[in-house]
Amino acid sequence: MERRKEILTWNDVDKLIDHLLPQFESTFDSMIMISRGGIIPGGLLAEAMDIQKLLIASVNFPSELEEMERPRLLAWPSFLMFPNEDLLNGDRILIVDDVWGSGRTITAVKNRVSAAGGFPFTCVLHFNPYRNLFGANRPNYFAATTDAFIIYPLEVDRDSTSSLLHNL
């Protein structure tokens, strides 16, 4: 069965950001944006919340996990990029990604922030509880719940012959 797809516009992304902002009851010392999906929402949130200390994390999981029906939790992530521990220690850190599907990537970043002495809080535009591998664990902040495969406006190829929209 083919998964349902949802194609978002930039206005949709703005509305999701507007839905997130009132959820934050306190401030954060810094933000980690997960590459690549968290960079755009992270930038928008950082600007709106005046977070100055912006950091990037890039995580990779073994490719064979993607092909499995239900990926194992025990696979070790490879951190291609991660902030130095002294940038995290003692800070309240907002970790931002576009979507929590399986939850593996953002959970790996959250655990590494905790291990470095930081206080992590997770934030995504979309939470998919149907793909979540972590039971009752969920993002601290999310704008929407979905079962769809989300296509964000930055992912839409503007060339009409090869775009995602053309193939739907």
Regions found by a protein language model. Give the residues of each.
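PRPP-associated nucleotide enzymes
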Residues: 1-168
